[in-house]
Regions:
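Glycine-centered tight-turn motifs at strand-turn-strand junctions
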Residues: 258-305
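Generic detector of contiguous secondary-structure segments
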Residues: 1, 36, 54-70, 165-167, ...
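Contiguous beta-strand segments within globular domains
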Residues: 211-248, 252-253, 279-283
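Short loop/turn segments at secondary-structure transitions that flank enzyme active sites
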Residues: 185, 209, 240, 255, ...
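Extracellular acidic loop/turn motifs
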Residues: 29-30, 239-242, 289-292
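Beta-propeller blade termini and top-face loops
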Residues: 1-220, 227-228, 235
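Short intrinsically disordered coil segments
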Residues: 193-200, 251, 298-303
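Short, glycine-anchored, charge-dense loop/turn motifs used at functional sites
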Residues: 144, 253-257, 305
Length: 305
């Protein structure tokens, strides 16, 4: 009722009208299978290209189906990001079904209580590797949602509105802080329980190419290109500072000659490896070790001006 006792006038904006389809997801396995999620918590599926629909809504309080993700690995598996922030419930809700929505289960913990989830995506190469965009940043899971870990790094603490796994990168859309791209998901795809039990693990090294770059530089804002040299990524755990073990990485030619060497006991800062616990990236630009001049030979000197 309005203030004077009469009916409320519908202003026609539609904001007070619920039951609006909010998200539609077509299965990558079949164009006939389509999911539709609404802003009142209902989820429907069609398996005949839209000729008929079936209600597969999870038994939850009224909320919004913010995104739907059909697994790129299993046609019967689907994830939904569900939220109730409009009801002052800011808890994170991620649900999974392995039978086309006939039954649902809530995925695990690890996401902050007040970080409601806007989007969830599964990695296109590694099954069970999930990424979740929340109101306060990004989380990832390596065990198909049983546990979640915050994965913020240098990304601003900002609402994540969408995520896309594009080839080997994760593209992030934020609310108010532009687009961000995480280059090279390879270490996450290699990560496993077996690796976690090892004190040291070296990830697969990609092929690299040495190129000559122009001295001319474009002006203005631009994206940052990947490192043009060779990157060696490795993981260390249970590091004892008193341990005398030396960590050494050598780059060698086809005839097994050492081109460049790095070690944890090097006296040269540019050749020294940090042995702190965690993930590390060693970069080699293709330059080789210098040589020592014979005694009595002086290097050339010159000036320009």
């Amino acid at each position: 009722m309005g203030p004077g006792g009469g009916p409320i006038t519908n202003e026609g904006a539609g904001g007070e009208v619920y039951h609006t389809i909010y998200y539609i997801a077509e299965s990558p396995h079949s164009k006939e299978v389509i999911y539709a999620g609404a802003d009142d918590g209902l989820v429907h599926i069609t398996t005949d290209g839209g000729n008929s629909w079936k209600n597969i809504s999870p038994k939850l309080e009224e909320g919004m189906i913010n995104s739907i993700e059909v697994s790129p690995h299993n046609p019967s598996t689907v994830y939904i990001a569900y939220n109730r922030y409009k009801f002052d419930d800011f808890k994170p809700y991620i649900l999974k079904s392995t039978d086309y929505g006939s039954s649902w289960k809530m995925l695990g913990t690890g996401i902050e209580e007040n970080s409601f989830v806007r989007v969830v995506r599964e990695d296109i190469e590694k099954e069970g590797l999930l990424y979740a965009g929340t109101e306060r940043g990004i989380y990832m899971s390596i065990d198909d949602g049983i546990s979640w870990h915050k994965w913020q790094r240098n990304l601003p603490v900002v609402p994540i509105t969408d995520l896309v796994v594009h080839k080997n990168d994760l593209v992030v859309a934020t609310q108010g802080r532009s687009f961000w791209i995480l280059d090279d998901l390879s270490p996450l795809r290699e990560y496993s329980d077996e690796m976690r039990s090892k004190n040291i693990h070296m990830f697969d090294v990609k092929d690299s190419h040495k190129v000559l770059r122009s001295a001319m530089r474009r002006q203005g804002p631009m994206g940052k290109n990947p490192y043009y040299g060779t990157e060696v990524k490795f993981f260390l755990r249970d590091i004892d500072e008193e341990d005398s073990t030396v960590l050494k990485v050598e780059f060698m030619s086809e005839d097994m000659k050492v081109l460049r060497s790095y070690s944890s006991d090097s006296e040269l800062r540019q050749n020294k490896i940090d042995i702190a616990e965690g993930f590390h990236t060693l970069r080699w630009g293709g330059n080789v070790e210098g040589f020592e001049l014979p005694k009595g030979v002086m290097p050339p000197r010159g000036s320009q001006g």
